[in-house]
From Swiss-Prot:
The gene is GHRH. Belongs to the glucagon family. GRF is released by the hypothalamus and acts on the adenohypophyse to stimulate the secretion of growth hormone. This is Somatoliberin. InterPro entries: Glucagon_GIP_secretin_VIP, VIP/GHRH-like. PROSITE patterns: GLUCAGON. Its main location: secreted. Keywords: Amidation, Secreted. It is found in: Secreted.
Length: 44
């Protein structure tokens, strides 16, 4: 019983961690694109 609870919460935490990492990756990618756009405007 305790094992089942532990496994369940462990899975939940893992899911939250991977979701958070995914969000950070997306945010970083958007930030990079924005920076590239600004750099292109500066060059023009």
């Amino acid at each position: 019983y305790a094992d089942a609870i532990f496994t369940n919460s462990y899975r939940k935490v893992l899911g939250q961690l991977s979701a958070r990492k995914l969000l950070q990756d997306i945010m970083n990618r958007q930030q990079g694109e924005r920076n590239q756009e600004q750099g292109a405007k500066v060059r023009l």
